[in-house]
Amino acid sequence: DLRMSRGLGDVYKRQVQEAFAWNPGFREYFAVKATPNPFLINILKEYGCGCDCSSMTELMMADALGFQGEEIMFSSNDTPAEEFAFAAKIGATINLDDFTHIDYLEKTIGYIPETISCRYNPGGVFKISNSIMDNPGDAKYGFTHDQILEGYKILKEKGAKRFGIHAFLASNTVTNDYYPTLAKTLFETVVEIKEKTGVKMDFINLSGGVGIPYRPGEEGNDIRAIGEGVCRVYEEVLVPAGMGDVAIYTEMGRFMMGPYGCLVTTAIHEKHTHKEYIGVDACAVNLMRPAMYGAYHHITVMGKEDAPCDHTYDVTGSLCENNDKFAIDRQLPKIDMGDLLVLHDTGAHGFAMGYNYNGKLKSAEILLKENGDFELIRRAETPKDYFATFDCFDILKDMKDPYQK
């Protein structure tokens, strides 16, 4: 996996910060789940990003990197008690996913934190104009409308003083209208919450969902237009309600990191049967999205950028699963053994979604720095890593390692 450092700072400083400069309290909480590499997260930390964490290990990483207190947002679901306890210990802002977690959190840590957030799910379908973007009513996340009203009443009674609300209603949207439409839903909801419970929000978290164009020629999101759209709704809904000081938060893992990573793999096999296949030395272990979602990732054959795309291939990995294909019926230049193939836009939800099925090992991660130098920021997995959870037994003591010389 290859990452590019220059783009990471540029996208935040020159795009995201400018887009939301109208909101003094704005903060981007990078979604650690998208790309959990401490070297990359440190780059974003330099620009003032916080961390959006969803698990114990993500909290541990954020804490180890020096993120403190409200620089960490903990948004989890089906949450184990020990994760709530650690989040509270390091002062992270806890974003509750469920009404029953109010009582569960209090019993777990002995109190309700002064700063607390709740995740809202309005149900039904989420539309932009007449287009259905997603189906929140079928999602496992969040409080219902009635639950969130009651929830804030209870949290206030139990001593909470600073409140936030969060919602994620559609994934990987490529439209400048998603955040403004989501914002309108949340802004109107928090006005109602204030009127019915007396709870005034201190921050509103629009979460993620801002996507990137994966296909050449597709028009991407204009984050400045998105920021302007959110600002308009803010002034229409919140300001007249006396809530013109509410901070806006975002959690844009894919938008922040997706375009700035690629998977580099080598053609090692060609097969001519009912179709033309090119086998590469990467597989779904390194990039799961095409196999899991049927997702498109553009492929460049290095050194043949200007060659005609006059061959049709399925580009495959070696897993014992027929869906382990990076491309199906893709028009590409003639591929020879040893050619390097670059799969684009793998910087988010790429390496992070990797796994070890078939005993496959995950690749290294390399950072391409602004000066053109390369830096190893994660070594490749080894067989020793794969078998590490058996290291307290002697059942594999006679195993030979063909990689050891």
Language-model segment annotations:
Residues 1-12:
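Single conserved hydrophobic/aromatic residue that forms the stacking wall/gate
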Residues 13-21:
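A short, N-terminal amphipathic alpha-helix
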Residues 26-203, 212:
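Active-site-proximal beta-alpha core segment in soluble small-molecule metabolic enzymes
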Residues 31, 54, 75, 97, ...:
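Generic beta-strand/beta-sheet core signal
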Residues 35, 100, 143-146, 150, ...:
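Conserved active-site and cofactor/substrate-binding residues in soluble primary-metabolism enzymes
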Residues 173-189, 219-228, 263-268, 398-405:
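Short, electropositive alpha-helical surface patch
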Residues 180-238, 245-249:
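Acidic, glycine-rich loop-and-beta core segments that form the ion-binding/anion-interacting portion
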Residues 235-239, 243-405:
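Charged (often Lys/Glu-rich) extended helix/loop segments that serve as interaction or gating elements
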